[in-house]
């Protein structure tokens, strides 16, 4: 039983004149249905979230960013109705570290995930766990790359980090008829045809089901392309680029330009395919009348050098590697008039920003910044720099290939980094967008270099980052690495050790 003191005027909105106050005793039998309906209403007012994460899509490769070669009409339309965070970066530009920061809101030296193919702590407070606790349905489709038990192994529910709906493979770069596992079954299944197309169909089915639910949802779609191999998109998209002359970045060495142009055709074909699927997902949300209260995020885990500075793939601090597309579409909060934001959003900032937009308390474990008030225009953006880093080079940028540890700051206009030996790179990204003129050590830029060094030290102090040699962190976290200081992922058992054959 519960006592509630009200007046007839409050109950029926009558004038209080000549009415005397009355006290009523309401039983919980009467009140509970009312309270439940309020809870359901509040839940329905929470935004849905469709988070589209692609792999290795650099920021410069969209029509809306000014690229006249790649065909991305659906993304261009989405950008015209969204906030385009033009300075979004992947602070540790490689797959697993970005995904761990996305899930935890933490920097790599806090969650321990600073290399590929290591396990994100199953006890971590993660994005899906927080949303699930707040009443959300949670789902994940596609590439995971946070399990650390080899790339083809079944991931049991205890390592699914709070996602209820689950169609996932740890990692593959075969984008046609690749394998996946569902939530509680170790039976290997296969996507039908091109993975991104089949996964999109699964998203559409999920949205149909969620339209019948009173709960909001968080659905993450993680697409493996346009990461290499570049030439495996469906023919209907490859034909757009056949024999097409492609603009190649000026920082690509002459000896690589023919290869890079050919690879870029395939890279763009993957993108145009994905773009078409994004159009389907948007149309489904509109058909279900869910578009206005659904936050759509489109972004990538990192970029792709694709020949720039003589390298492919990522890890390095150049623009093509660290800068990622980042569109956030939320009509109920932002309207549908597109805008461009200079906010320096980094990988750990995504979780708190989504929580802020969803009016969910941010856990104390989160280190990233909540940009929701900035995006809504309620606060001024006071962030002047953000941290970029490589804690331990490995794989395609192992030491024998020139890989090295670095720490740096990105301010939008400037990129500054130092390695273990001292200042390494300084670029003015406005006057030198392809970063071909290193300003380190030039007398006329000494004041700028000192200012950026001070900013870097401030960021390192915030993170308690001592900037040690990479193997010190490998030993601290007890990771097993091979002769190239890379975590092995082929023939690995559940303790993370290679299987002796």
Question: Which residues does each PLM region occupy?
Answer:
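Short, charged, surface-exposed hinge/linker loops at domain edges
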Residues: 465-481
């Amino acid at each position: 039983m519960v006592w509630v003191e009200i007046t007839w005027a409050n109950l029926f909105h009558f004038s209080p004149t000549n009415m005397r106050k009355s006290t009523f005793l309401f039983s919980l039998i009467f009140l509970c249905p009312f309270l439940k309906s309020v809870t359901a209403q509040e839940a329905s007012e929470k935004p849905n979230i469709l988070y589209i994460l692609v792999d290795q899509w650099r920021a410069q490769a969209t029509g809306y960013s000014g690229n006249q070669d790649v065909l991305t009409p659906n993304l261009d339309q989405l950008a015209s109705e969204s906030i385009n965070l033009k300075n979004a970066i992947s602070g540790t530009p490689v797959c697993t570290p970005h995904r761990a920061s996305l899930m935890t809101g933490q920097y790599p030296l806090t969650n321990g995930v600073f290399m590929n193919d290591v396990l994100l702590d199953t006890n971590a407070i993660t994005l899906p766990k927080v949303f699930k606790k707040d009443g959300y349905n949670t789902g994940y489709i596609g590439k995971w790359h946070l399990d650390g038990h080899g790339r083809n192994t079944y991931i049991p529910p205890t390592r699914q980090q709070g996602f209820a709906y689950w169609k996932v493979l740890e990692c593959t770069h075969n984008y046609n008829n690749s394998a996946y596992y569902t939530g509680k079954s170790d039976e290997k299944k296969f996507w039908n045809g091109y993975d991104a197309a089949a996964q999109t169909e699964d998203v559409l089915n999920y949205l149909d089901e969620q339209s019948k639910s009173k709960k909001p949802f968080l659905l993450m779609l993680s697409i493996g392309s346009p990461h290499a191999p570049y030439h495996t998109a469906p023919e209907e998209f490859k034909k757009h680029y056949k024999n097409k002359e492609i603009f190649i970045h000026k920082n690509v060495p002459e000896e690589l330009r023919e290869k890079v142009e050919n690879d870029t055709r395939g890279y763009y074909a993957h993108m145009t395919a994905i773009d078409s699927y994004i159009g389907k997902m948007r149309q489904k949300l509109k058909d279900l009348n869910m578009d206005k209260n659904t936050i759509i995020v489109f972004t990538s885990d990192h970029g792709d050098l694709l020949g720039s500075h003589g390298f492919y793939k990522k890890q390095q601090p150049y623009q093509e590697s660290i800068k990622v597309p980042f569109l956030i579409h939320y009509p109920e909060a932002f309207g549908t008039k597109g805008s461009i934001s200079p906010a320096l959003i980094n990988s750990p900032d995504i979780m708190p920003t989504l929580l802020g937009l969803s009016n969910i308390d941010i856990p104390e474990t989160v280190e990233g910044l909540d940009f929701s008030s900035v995006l809504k225009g309620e606060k001024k953006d006071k962030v002047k720099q953000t941290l970029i880093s490589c804690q331990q080079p490995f794989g395609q940028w192992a030491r024998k290939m020139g890989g090295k540890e670095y720490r740096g700051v990105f301010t939008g206009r400037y990129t500054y980094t130092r390695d273990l030996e001292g200042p390494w790179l300084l670029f003015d990204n406005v006057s030198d967008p392809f970063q071909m003129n290193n300003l380190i050590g030039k007398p006329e830029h000494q004041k700028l270099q000192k200012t950026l060094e001070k900013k870097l030290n401030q960021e390192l102090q915030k993170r308690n980052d001592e900037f040690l040699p990479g193997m010190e962190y490998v030993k601290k976290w007890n990771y097993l690495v091979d002769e190239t200081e890379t975590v092995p992922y082929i023939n690995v058992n559940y303790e993370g050790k290679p299987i002796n054959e």
